[in-house]
């Protein structure tokens, strides 16, 4: 069986692109030889779980658990399946008109270990999993005829030791397959191999770095040519209008059978800034001329934005810029039983990455432990979400030179996306070669972004340290401690007390570079409301072993609300990204959705993020007394003195009224009072308050509504108060539901 499909081709005067996305024949073998017969179909892009009929080991990859067990990590070597070779096959017609052209097959992303055959000739192989692979197929093609393309994709078990492909101790299965676009391009004997448009908004220019690939044969005999003259024309247009705002032609020589580097700068006419609120895009076009003949034309989108740091803060286009958002762990989501083809559904991804985040005032996302298909970045470019882009490096894997090769390819490949503002080389680890040798080298290639090196700080990196990523998981101890009541008496965690510093917070306060808290919480749930593998003890401690999904979700929402308020109240923190916006269900952690993930139905935690992440907000600085067990109850009829904490992430003053409401266990408002507040730009304001507590013992809810001038709806903060000894359970409080 062979897959004969029409292909979609488009030309750009010098380059013709033939898309090979679509349905391919597919099958698996235990040995490294192709199957005699192909019995399945598979979409490209798409991992092996999308094959139909299903692959034989499908149930091993996606078995749903009967219950929750406390598990801290998984050793990848303890596999419960048989590694297989995966074979993608199809035929494509190559027109006779291309016989004088140079043809390349490009696979944007494929994992793990990819070999390509055209008409039974091997044309190349690659161990890279997260960056594009280009294969010269010119010599193997039959023109005016159908051509068989066969792609073998290996298993993670066979990834060579030198490959820059880390492991993730919170993953169990690493699904192989082709997971980004596949296409053929036809050009002349010189072609754009790679290009970077690197903006400087402050200077009003863009620096363009180009690698030109020459396909002329190398010098074989003495006196044969080694180089050929060429011209490269650069043209910058506004993406939406097509108006040309900059143009330049340079001349040079391209070394035969090699890649040649060119660099130039282009001044732009009245450049418009790219920001999350106004994501203005340009198109950068590169045309290569060989003996005055156009032989290739290639274009990319980019944006004019300057992302940098000043002291402990990030800056965007010269202004202080606080990052607010969450994390995406797509490689983990791939092992979700409900993942299916959602990762390649543009509308679903737009809702996940753009619509939902912007609805709650998020402006940023961390692509965590592994990058994403290229169109995800395109969406963030187009709609204005800034990204911290992290390689899959958690547990160490890879030899230095191969890591250098893959990371360099990564910067060239993803470096035109204005949404990517931070390269994240490592997650929660240390690597001296990456931090002190490779990052400075890559900073020379792309000086327009900041590098994060995991847990490496200025102590290990000196002046190479541009930012840190602290992870203040204050509830982590709950995973192991068997005597939690005694633990909290000796190590009190007053959840909601915004003024109290955590013992691990000193390094954040003392650091001299921006601190991006891109993980915190440790309060994950599965989408059915059950605790995750890492948080079973958390919920058992606070709620008991038979808590309902609704009770678990309410605790999670409240906990994350208060921890977010705590972090945002420390204004020296440069950004806060909650963990996690998308991950696999039934795993070690969890995300902010409930029920079927295809519907992206937000959990209560996500709905409360609208308030604690509001750019301008007012929080209650009081410790929780509903769930925490080590605090004494408040005295009935006493005066409660506390602060309201106003925070402002914006470069303009925020002002308005704060309405305080005290509700009893039935939701009845028993008292109100009003305060006025003004918060300076990028500032913090402490507003002292005095509240007369009721004389009746019970469980109460204190709500602060911040009615900001110019904002339609109030921003809420809440605290549960235990007054007297009448309350015996967390159930004896009013459940406040957001509309």
Model regions: which residues?
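Substrate-binding/catalytic cleft of secreted carbohydrate-active enzymes
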Residues: 349-352, 364-596
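Beta-strand-rich binding/interaction modules
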Residues: 116-118, 205-252, 637-678, 684-689, ...
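Active-site-adjacent substrate/metal-binding segments within catalytic domains
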Residues: 51-94, 98-106, 111-119, 124-127, ...
């Amino acid at each position: 069986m062979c897959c004969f499909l029409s292909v979609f081709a488009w030309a750009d005067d010098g380059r013709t692109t033939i898309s090979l996305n679509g349905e391919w024949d597919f099958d698996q073998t235990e040995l490294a030889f192709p199957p005699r017969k192909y019995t399945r179909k598979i979409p490209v892009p798409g991992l092996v779980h999308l094959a139909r009929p299903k692959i034989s080991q499908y149930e091993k990859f996606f078995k749903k658990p009967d219950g929750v067990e406390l598990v801290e990590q998984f050793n990848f070597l303890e596999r419960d399946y048989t590694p297989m070779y995966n074979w993608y096959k199809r035929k494509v017609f190559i027109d006779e008109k291309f016989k004088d052209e140079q043809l390349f097959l490009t696979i944007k992303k494929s994992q793990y270990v990819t070999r390509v055959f055209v008409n039974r000739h091997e044309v190349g192989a690659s161990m890279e999993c997260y960056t594009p692979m280009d294969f010269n197929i010119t010599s193997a093609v039959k023109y005016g005829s159908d051509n068989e393309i066969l792609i073998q994709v290996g298993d993670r078990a066979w990834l060579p030791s030198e490959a820059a492909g880390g492991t993730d101790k919170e993953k169990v299965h690493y699904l192989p397959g082709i997971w980004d676009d596949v296409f053929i391009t036809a050009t002349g004997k010189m072609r754009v191999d790679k290009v970077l448009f690197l903006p400087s908004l402050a200077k009003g220019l863009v620096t363009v770095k180009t690698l030109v690939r020459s396909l002329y044969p190398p010098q074989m005999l003495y006196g044969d040519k080694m180089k050929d003259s060429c011209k490269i024309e650069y043209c910058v247009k506004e993406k939406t209008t097509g108006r040309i705002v900059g143009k330049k032609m340079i001349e040079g020589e391209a070394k035969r059978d090699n890649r040649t580097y060119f660099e130039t700068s282009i001044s732009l006419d009245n450049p418009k800034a790219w920001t999350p609120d106004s994501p203005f895009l340009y198109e950068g076009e590169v045309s290569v001329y060989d003996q005055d003949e156009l032989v290739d034309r290639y274009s990319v989108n980019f944006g004019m934005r300057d992302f940098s740091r000043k002291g402990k803060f990030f800056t965007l286009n010269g202004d202080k810029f606080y990052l607010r958002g969450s994390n995406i762990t797509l490689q983990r989501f791939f092992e979700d039983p409900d993942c299916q083809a959602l990762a390649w559904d543009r509308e679903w991804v737009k809702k996940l990455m753009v619509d939902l985040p912007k609805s709650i005032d998020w402006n940023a996302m961390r692509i965590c432990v592994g990058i994403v298909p290229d169109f995800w970045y395109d969406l963030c470019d187009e709609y204005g979400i800034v990204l911290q882009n992290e390689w899959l490096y958690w547990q160490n894997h890879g030899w230095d030179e191969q890591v250098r090769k893959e990371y360099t390819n990564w910067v060239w490949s993803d470096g035109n996306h204005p949404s990517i503002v931070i390269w994240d080389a490592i997650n929660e680890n240390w690597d001296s070669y990456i931090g002190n040798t490779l990052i400075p080298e890559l900073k020379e290639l792309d000086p327009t972004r900041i590098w994060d090196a995991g847990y490496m700080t200025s102590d290990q990196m000196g002046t190479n340290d541009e930012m840190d990523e602290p992870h203040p998981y204050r509830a982590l101890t709950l995973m192991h401690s068997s005597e939690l009541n005694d633990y909290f008496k000796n190590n009190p965690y007053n959840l909601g007390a915004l003024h109290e510093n955590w013992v691990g917070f000193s390094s954040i306060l003392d650091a001299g570079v921006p601190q991006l808290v891109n993980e915190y919480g440790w309060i994950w749930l599965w989408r059915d409301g059950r605790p995750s593998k890492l948080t079973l003890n958390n919920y058992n401690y606070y709620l008991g072993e038979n808590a309902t999904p609704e009770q678990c979700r309410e605790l999670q929402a409240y906990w994350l609300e208060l921890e977010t308020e705590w972090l945002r109240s420390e204004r020296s923190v440069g950004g806060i990204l909650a963990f996690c916006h998308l991950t696999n269900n039934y795993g070690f952690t969890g995300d902010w959705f409930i029920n079927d993930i295809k519907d992206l139905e937000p959990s209560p935690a996500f709905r409360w993020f609208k308030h604690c992440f509001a750019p301008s907000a007012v929080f209650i600085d009081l410790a929780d007394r509903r769930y925490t067990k080590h605090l004494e109850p408040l005295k009935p009829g006493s005066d409660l003195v506390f602060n309201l904490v106003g925070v402002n992430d914006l470069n303009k003053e925020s002002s308005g009224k704060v309405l305080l409401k005290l509700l009893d266990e039935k939701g009845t408002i028993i008292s109100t009072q009003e305060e006025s507040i003004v918060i300076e730009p990028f500032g913090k304001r402490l507003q002292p308050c005095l509240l007369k507590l009721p004389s009746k013992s019970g469980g109460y809810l204190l709500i602060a509504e911040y009615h900001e001038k110019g904002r339609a709806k109030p921003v809420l903060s809440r605290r549960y108060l235990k007054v007297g000894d009448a309350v015996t359970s967390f159930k004896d409080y009013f459940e406040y539901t957001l509309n």
